[in-house]
């Protein structure tokens, strides 16, 4: 196969990056309300959602060397296949245990998906041209993510507004569409992502797993020695708590105000879309302000 140019690598990277976030945009307006529709209480929704965070926390560092050991393509294909399985299960889940499994699978997906696409882009860019500037592509990915999530959320709101499709509830339709788009994204990934070099083998994976506890210890040590780092981590921690609370309670409160969960989800679609478009604009403007 002909070697990719820098421009081709960037185009493929941004295409895959957008496809990675599009299903997320579709599910954002309906996640909480769909679980409520299936019988979960707010406290149960909070508990099942923790599965994702716990799995990511447990796997993030140990799986960090998988891309080096097996190759970015293998890891990303596995991650996106797990995401597809999670979305398919989300569409039919009707119990606490099944929703817990859905979120645990999402945790596996996010742990595996964290990093390989970016590293592939950097390595492929440098393989095409050792002097190429890859930072603009990485920076533009934030804009692409914002735009695709906004598009997915807007599409989700439109699908919900159209109402149920046969026996499928209006809140379930966006999840099914998200699963279909995830399947398309998986096929596109197989076509577009071409490895630039051989995988490093099992030794790289063993080294990553062995180094994980030491890296955690070093990170904790840095936090203890640096008040600036501790403050930054604290900001992220409290911001995360606030966002999770906001994203969990807003749909429920809106459903109470308008008197209909489906109408609330339909309104959340364009509202989320506008928010993510602003995020995309901010990501695009950031390089100009630095």
Predicted regions and their residues:
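Cytoplasmic helix-loop-helix junction between adjacent transmembrane helices
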Residues: 102-146
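Hydrophobic core of transmembrane alpha-helices in multi-pass small-molecule transporters
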Residues: 18, 86, 96-113, 237
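Helix-loop boundary and gating motifs at the non-cytosolic
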Residues: 2-58, 91, 227-276
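Structural signature of the two symmetry-related core transmembrane helices
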Residues: 74-89, 179
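Symmetry-related core transmembrane helices of the 12-TM Major Facilitator Superfamily/SLC fold
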Residues: 169-191
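Juxtamembrane intracellular "pre-TM" segments in multi-pass secondary transporters
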Residues: 1-8, 192-234
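Transmembrane alpha-helix termini and helix-breaking/packing motifs in multi-pass membrane transporters
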Residues: 37, 149-175, 251-260, 284-289
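Helix-to-loop junctions at the C-terminal end of transmembrane segments
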Residues: 58-71, 160, 281-290
